[in-house]
Amino acid sequence: VSEETEVVVVGAGQAGVAMSEHLGSQGVPHIVLERHRIAERWRSERWDSLVANGPAWHDRFPGLEFSDVAPDAFASKEQVAEYFVAYAEKIGAPVRTGVEVTSVRRRAGRSGFRVETSQGSIDARFVVAATGPFQRPVFPPIVPDGAVPVQMHSSGYRNPEQLPEGAVLVVGAGSSGVQIADELRRSGRRVFLSVGPHDRPPRQYRGRDFCWWLGVLGRWDAETPPQGAEHVTIAVSGARGGHTVDFRALAADGVELVGMTASYDGGVLRFAPDLATNIAVGDEKYLELLRAADAYVERNGLDLPEEPEAHVLAPDPACVTEPRLELDLAEAGVTSIVWATGFAADYGWLQVDTFDEKGRPVQRRGVSAEPGVYFLGLPWLSRRGSSFIWGVWHDARYVADHIVTRRGYLAYDTTDH
């Protein structure tokens, strides 16, 4: 006999916990199913020294501050995970851990869905997929197995001691790739960093964090991504107290920058001749935000210290002006490649008709093309801020309101009019 509830929420990370708060506050019966522990990916699928990319005053839910992190500091991955555990306890979230959802199907000839799990089946009127975009590590099959002793995705990287002696190539210049490359260099490794197109906002400018600037400039609320920018790599770091990602500074410290990793043949990697362009475009995005911030300060008469030095960029290093286009891995002593090339969503368990030909959810603000199915925690779900901790909280409120409204219509048949 199947258990019954109104809503099954799949996943108890930031999206699932936020969803539970809004459903609970409106009295909607629901269950949150989590195959491991609350916020598991923060605990076991990130490197040891990871901290949040936004300050604690910003990267949180409205209802609870971090108890053990100063507002302008950056929470460690353990502190972030414990924050969500504490939040779930605070709101009394009905989370069941250690329960894996194996399939969700629409029930034949009647409303609602059958949710099959590792601990039996549940019938629900609504299902919220709150598993997020980081399900499946992805990296291009460029370098064959065995070409170097170790190839791993950034989700498997923990610390420098984990890798064999020798040089390391890090592929990907988003927050993960940059922080891992910097940590490896500081541990004494020779490091090559493959840099693609990216955005590198200032960590702080004129005394305020970039999260604040994006807020007052209205950029978190941008509703549709700029053309081609849906998956822009953002290079930002809260490591060591937080600092602006500066590829020139990395190069000056000994990291050798190369372009996009293009191909491999006979022990030699080839890189695209795009490094200077990628650096220049990232610089222009950085400078554009500074100019927008200056205009905002002037227009609103704010008393914030000027910071003209932030506009001054160091000369391009030799690795940019005369880029290396080939790397003989053995000759350079490269024994490890870390692919910081992102993730893909995995909705293999969600067997309903709401995906396009590329397997992407067909949805608007989390409301899917399949009535009763919702998505939460995806980039650009409603706005730029959607994949961030505070952004997903607001998206969850919208989804909960939609569920409550739909419940009202469904209740029409069972009430006196």
Protein language model regions, located:
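Redox-cofactor-proximal catalytic regions of oxidoreductases
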Residues: 39-65, 250
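A short acidic, helix-capping loop that chelates divalent metal ions and anchors anionic groups
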Residues: 67-71
